[in-house]
Each structure stands twice: as C-alpha cells, then as structure tokens.
Amino acid sequence: METLVLSNILHFESGEDEYLFHGLTGNILKLDDVAKEFVHFAKELGDRTGDSFHVDASRYLDGRAADHRDMLEELMQLEIVNPAGRFSATPLAPKQTEKLPVKTLVFHLVNECNLRCTYCYAGDGEYGAPKKYMTMETADRAIEFLMENSFQEESVTIVLFGGEPFLNWKVLKHIVERAVEQGEKWGKKVHFSLTTNGTLMTTEQMQFLHKYQIGTSVSMDGTRVAHDKNRPMAGGQGSYERVSKNVAQLVATHKSAPVGTRVTVAKGFEKLETSLAHLLSKGFYEVGFAPVTETDQDLALGIEDLNELLRQFRELSDRYVEHALRNEYLGFSNLTNVLKELHMGTNKAYGCGAGLGFFAVSPDGGLFLCHRFNENEQFRMGDIYSGVDRNKQRQMLDELHVDRKESCATCSLKHICSGGCYYEAMERQGDYRRPNAHYCDWMHQWITIGLQVYVRILEGNPAFLDTISGTGKERCVSN
C-alpha cells in the first residue's frame, strides 16, 4: 500500500468511547479497537499538516492482522483516508452566477437608531452614511426585485432590519403586506424575520408580528446591570426597563413564531448562566450569545475572556444534554445551531450565504454583500433597479471560496466554519478574504464540545436531533 492521508479529522472522546469527525464529508465514526490503533499510530508517527496525517500504510500494516487492512479499505470507501494528493471533493465556486437565485433580502428600513450601544458595528445605526429612511416606492421595487430574481424558488425570506426598523413603522408594515400580496401573485411563500432593540414596540405592532408570523429577535444583554452597561438610550439613560416591559407584552401577544434574543458578549460579561436564566424567564424561546466584533480593548474579548466564554459554554452544554435526554429544549441557540449542522451533514464552501442567495438592500436601493457591509461601497453588489452585478458576484465568490484559504485546507472544520465571517475577518485580519485566524483554536474546542454533545444525545434520545433539525430522519453515528 502507498502513503495514505488521514485527512481533516477531529479526534475526540465522549465517556469511554473515541470518535472521529471527518471535516470533508461530515462523517462521525465511533472507533473500534482496530480503528483506534490506526488513528493513534497516525497521530504519533504520521507526518502532520494541520488536522491531516500522512501515514506509510505498509509500515502500519506490517505484522498486523488482516482486519487492519479491511479497516483501512473501509475508511478509504468513506473517503476519510485517501491516497496522498487526493481529497474529497469541495463544492466548486459557481461559474454562472446569472443562475443563482436571490433567496433572502435584508431590508435596511432606516439608517438610524434610538440607542447608542457601545459596541455597535453600524455607528449608531447610520453605517457611516447620512441618515436615510426607505420609502414605500423603494420598498416596492425591492420586493419586485426579490420576486423576479428568486427565479424558481418556491419561498423567499425578507429580513426587516435597521438601524432600528420600528423607526420606519409605516414602511415596515407596507413591506410585509405588499410582499404577501406579491408572493401570492408569483406563487411564492414569503417568510419574515425582524431584529429590533425592543424599545419602540406598540400593541398594534406586536399584534402585527403575530398576524404575519414574523420571527422576531430582540437584542437584550441579560439582567438590568449587564444590559444597561452597553445599551443606553440616545439620551444616556438605560434602556432595560423599556425593553423588559415590551418583551413581556410581546411574548404574551406574539405566539405564531419564535421570539428569541441575542446577547452581545463584551469584556467583563455577565455569567452566561445568569443571562440565560434571566432571559428565558422573560419568555424568550431561545438565547444566542455573540462575541463582540469591536476591536476596542475596553470591549474586545482577549484570550482569557475567550477561554472563560468557552468554559461557560461547556457548562451550558452539559445542562443542554440533561434537558435533551428528558426531551426538553433548553434555549441555548449557539449549541442548537452546531447540532443542526452536524445532524444535517453540512458541507459549506463559504462562511455564510452572503453574496450567494443573500443580500442587503440599503434605504435607497443599493445591494450590498450583507447587512454588516451596508453602505460600504467596496461591497456594493449592484442595486434593485439594474440588478446584481454578476461579474462582481462571480469575482467575490471566487475570492471567498474556502479553497482560496490555504490555512483551511487541512482543517477539520473546513466545511463547518469555512473561514468564518467576512466582516469580522476585515475587522480583525484587515482582509475580508482571510479566515478568522483569531478564533481557530477556540472554534476547534467549541465544535469538539458540540460533537461530544451530539453523540451523547444521539445515543440517548436521537429523536430530539430530528426535532430541532426538522429533518424527519435520523443521522446515525457509524460503528
């Protein structure tokens, strides 16, 4: 046998068992004694590059029984082991972008906000541009653009965003009603989601969200002290009291779609268990924790902060398993998202859908790579009048493809992470095309936790994974 490559693997333990996660195929293998022996041999005596190991197969098989050769052949069939120089296929960058449908459009209803959050990437909601409000005429054209450019897609998604979208309530209401009308005309189901700071919602607006089944995310940072620390009103006073009061009414009124919350985690963050318990007690369906992207040293998470965040993520993950084995859902959405990707065998060539089927539309109709790049001319991708700049889209997708990121080539997370967020890469690495190297070690540890949780739930209550993923089928761990 020739030199073989045990490629893109994450070797982990759960209880007394050992497993392999293969980052190119998404396969998860429970290792028997023969496979364990090979993996340990590869890690100890093979030539390592990233998460891949070159192994002299003849040396390994010398003196070993036939079942070791059978095991290698099985791993080769699964493409976890390959002859040197050959790897499992990666989804290619699209060559004919004209055929790519637009599936999701983020509507920036207004470049303005009534809060002054310390960590806001949008610069008080203005994105470095003059204050702008989307008009009904622009909204109508954006809806028409989405219908036309979604091609044969049976459903599309509209994200209602800002700034603070409720500052432009009349247009928000018009967008939803008009999109539903146009969806019926075009034979498409329109899904809606909305992100808000929660300070301005009225009873009428909450009833509207319920009527149109609008998935709603309220930005809230935990208890009063934690929230008011970084999310003051424009006048300087805390916003917690107003948000808390509105959330209580919102979750009582809006029953047709999940109401979740997003916590921005900055330096000096509140204990996550405290934040999670507090926010779930408010009636939120689930809570997501997002490390701040701000590079200011007073806000950014350092290595010690990230390690502490990971430690607390592990604690919450253990609680999540306890609930899942009782067939209960603990609304820790960071872990839910990882479990969904593992269960569905996610194989991403890009960090996200930005520029593929996902765009942001500015108040005046410009199309941008995503909502974080709103009003940034470098990332203008056309407009709703002349359409997507397909040449720029093709160039951008070629540049952003994970195979362009050399340091990702042998990584076990190649098709889960795919280099991460483009905006954060620009902020932290100075180049949107580079992988988020500052999070690599952290991501490996976090996904390892996710894998350990996954196999525990799969063995104890596999139906739970089907439920949260909406797959209707069980994705098994191979023995």
Residue ranges of predicted features:
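Detector for the c-type heme attachment site
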Residues: 121-126, 256, 412-416, 426
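Short Fe-S-cluster ligation motifs
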Residues: 143-161, 396-400, 434-479
